[in-house]
């Protein structure tokens, strides 16, 4: 099959878009991944639970779907451990058999925002469309705190 006056149209559905779920350990990445994909990745309150990437599908329209990759928790993109190396390699498209993400969901725990924001600059520097998700706001509120989301958005660009 070909388009009028143009090259042949590709056969089959377009390739799935790839979304990487990234953030520090225990920021809620795997919980969000499970909610989006309906899968049940192990969720625990200690580092190193996700040491490899997990991939699930998120159906967004009748026929469109996203590949969602749950990556190990990291504090930086300078790999110093096996789990940081996995995240680094996937984000840069260097992991064999895993497509480079088109988009990043950066999950930040607002109860540890000062420490977790350090990861935002190198993630944003990758130049991929990035959605920063401020997680655990209910816990921060319970502690009497709040986050200025609009101010933070302006500072992050």
Residue map of PLM features:
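Conserved C-terminal guanine-recognition region of P-loop GTPase G domains, centered on the G4
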Residues: 58-63, 86-157
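Conserved G1/Walker A P-loop phosphate-binding module
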Residues: 1-82, 94, 98-103
């Amino acid at each position: 099959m070909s388009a009028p006056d143009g090259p042949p149209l590709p056969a089959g559905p377009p390739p799935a878009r790839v979304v990487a779920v990234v953030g520090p350990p225990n920021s809620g990445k795997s919980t969000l991944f499970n909610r989006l994909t309906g899968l049940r990745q192990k969720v625990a309150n200690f580092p190193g639970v996700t040491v490899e990437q997990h991939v699930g599908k998120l159906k967004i329209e009748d026929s469109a779907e996203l590949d969602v990759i749950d990556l190990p928790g990291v504090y930086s993109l300078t790999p110093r451990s096996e789990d940081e190396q996995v995240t680094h390699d996937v984000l840069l498209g260097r992991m064999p058999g895993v497509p480079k993400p088109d988009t990043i969901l950066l999950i930040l725990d607002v109860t540890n925002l000062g420490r977790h924001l350090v990861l935002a600059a190198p993630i944003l520097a990758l130049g991929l469309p990035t959605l920063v998700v401020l997680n655990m706001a209910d816990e921060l509120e319970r502690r009497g705190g709040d986050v200025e989301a609009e101010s933070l958005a302006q500072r992050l660009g």
